[in-house]
């Protein structure tokens, strides 16, 4: 079976912003995403969004070009204003046409 290398971008964001982020991922070129409820604590042990729904973990498998667009969007429109975590992992996928 042929496998292709792609990037898995994982973003943990306040639930109130999840739909906006999901839309931005699509605009950036992501073909899909998975969103799940998440909870935890960051380096400051602060949870600003407990009242309005907690956090959501949004993940998408993308190519390098789409990843760059997503990271630029996060850096410009999210990181300066919101409590958000983001990391990128190298993954291998089957059915590459889906990503």
What are these regions (language model features)?
Residues 1-99:
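Positively charged, small/polar-rich N-terminal and surface patches that mediate targeting and assembly
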